[in-house]
UniProtKB/Swiss-Prot annotation:
Residues 453-483 form a propeptide. Residues 348-411 are annotated as: Hydrophilic. This is M protein, serotype 6. The keyword Transport does not apply.
Length: 483
């Protein structure tokens, strides 16, 4: 019975996902599986295909362990995916905060620029006002100097006129005294005329009362003295009286004119003094305004320098912000690329997870099926175990022949899943070939994935892509810290 299983070779690589392990397990314990492209059907082979039940249990335990490992890897990938999603959310939030901060800095820079423009305009206006006040101050100073010079000239002219008048009066008096001795006859007429003239002058000129009274008194005393002393000078006195009258008239007229000129000069001088005081006050006010404007100018220049420094600082911060924004843009692009890779890895992980779930489901179903069949086959295995023990002695004799034919057995074409393997064809059935034929496929599966039978590839798996995405995110965070 055992010789009928010699040519039954099953290919694990051509089985679908999740069916390879079930097929191997069932073939080991005696339940043959014929695999179709869309469904899995179990076919019971003859009793001669039954093997050691301990090995069947070992294989079942092995696939349970592999299923647990795949489930653990699936949980690990899910956790890593959640961590990467949280990191992506944090980076997006931080990028939004930096964008808002950049907008605030831009608005503050615009406000400072407007304030700088306003201060510049105000500084220009203050400079124009300062220039106008300086020009006006120069004009007032020039007018004040001209007024002072004119007042000094008029005062000098008045002094010269008074000195000349005094000198002329002294000369006239001396001349009159010299001629008075000859004018005694005309003293009475001179006195009468002088009285009338003095009265008329007193009536007309209230301002010269004291001077005229003193002159009249002096003249009366002089006349009396002259009359008493010089009786012989009447003719000279008459002439002197006429000359004196003319001189007095001329003097009075000159004095009146001089008084008028002096009054006008005093008024003008008072006006000049008042103008000088006003000009001095204005000049002091202008000086204060000028000092205040200079102080304001200094303050404005200081504020302008501070604003310029702040503007330069804001520009520098803006450049740093622009550089940071560009770095954030690069980081965001890198994070998006990493996100795409993570999403791709997540899709692959989800697909593998679905495949693992499907495989797990198939394994659960196959476990249920094998448990049912195991109960049925257990009795058969116990009955046939005795027969196998009896055949071990015979198989030991044929073991040497089977080792020689092992090479030819390994070159036999693999049986397709949809075709039946007919026992008895090819090599002669021998009972001792079963253990050696099971070792070859097990060596092949060491280089294959346990679920699909495909050749294992350490690169571009879901875990590798997840590691690459994590490294990309770490690089983005490091670049951000450097910026």
């Amino acid at each position: 019975m055992a010789k009928n299983n010699t040519n039954r070779h099953y290919s694990l690589r051509k089985l679908k996902k999740g069916t390879a392990s079930v097929a191997v397990a069932l073939s080991v314990i005696g339940a043959g599986l014929v695999v179709n492209t869309n469904e899995v059907s179990a076919r019971v082979f003859p009793r001669g295909t039954v093997e050691n039940p301990d090995k069947a249990r070992e294989l079942l335990n092995k696939y349970d362990v592999e299923n647990s490992m795949l489930q653990a890897n699936n949980d690990k990938l899910t956790t890593e995916n959640n961590n990467l999603t949280d990191q992506n959310k944090n980076l997006t939030t931080e990028n939004k905060n930096l964008t808002d901060q950049n907008k605030n800095l831009t608005t503050e820079n615009k406000n400072l620029t407007d304030q700088n423009k306003n201060l510049t305009t105000e500084n220009k206006e203050l400079k124009a006002e300062e220039n106008r006040l300086t020009t006006e101050n120069k004009g007032l100073t020039k007018k004040l100097s001209e007024a002072e010079e004119e007042a000094a000239n008029k005062e000098r002219e008045n002094k010269e006129a008074i000195g000349t008048l005094k000198k002329t009066l002294d000369e006239t008096v001396k001349d009159k005294i010299a001629k008075e001795q000859e004018s005694k006859e005309t003293i009475g007429t001179l006195k009468k005329t002088l009285d009338e003239t003095v009265k008329d002058k007193i009536a007309k000129e209230q301002e010269s009362k004291e001077t005229i009274g003193t002159l009249k008194k002096t003249l009366d005393e002089t006349v009396k003295d002259k009359i008493a002393k010089e009786q012989e000078s009447k003719e000279t006195i008459g002439t002197l009286k006429k000359i004196l009258d003319e001189t007095v008239k001329d003097k009075i007229a000159r004095e009146q004119k001089s008084k008028q000129d002096i009054g006008a000069l005093k008024q003008e001088l008072a006006k000049k003094d008042e103008g000088n005081k006003v000009s001095e006050a204005s000049r002091k006010g202008l000086r204060r305004d000028l000092d205040a404007s200079r102080e304001a100018k200094k303050q404005v220049e200081k504020d302008l320098a501070n604003l310029t420094a702040e503007l330069d600082k804001v520009k520098e911060e803006k450049q740093i912000s622009d550089a940071s924004r560009q770095g954030l843009r690069r980081d965001l692009d890198a994070s998006r690329e990493a996100k795409k890779q993570v999403e791709k890895a997540l899709e692959e992980a989800n697909s593998k997870l679905a495949a693992l779930e499907k495989l797990n489901k198939e394994l659960e179903e196959s476990k249920k099926l094998t448990e049912k069949e195991k109960a049925e086959l257990q009795a058969k295995l116990e009955a046939e175990a005795k027969a196998l023990k009896e055949q071990l002695a015979k198989q030991a004799e044929e073991l040497a022949k089977l080792r020689a034919g092992k090479a030819s057995d390994s070159q036999t074409p693999d049986a397709k899943p949809g075709n039946k393997v007919v026992p008895g064809k090819g090599q002669a059935p021998q009972a001792g070939t079963k253990p050696n034929q099971n070792k070859a496929p097990m060596k092949e599966t060491k280089r294959q994935l346990p679920s699909t039978g495909e050749t294992a590839n350490p690169f571009f798996t879901a875990a590798a892509l997840t590691v690459m995405a994590t490294a990309g995110v770490a690089a983005v965070v490091k670049r951000k810290e450097e910026n």
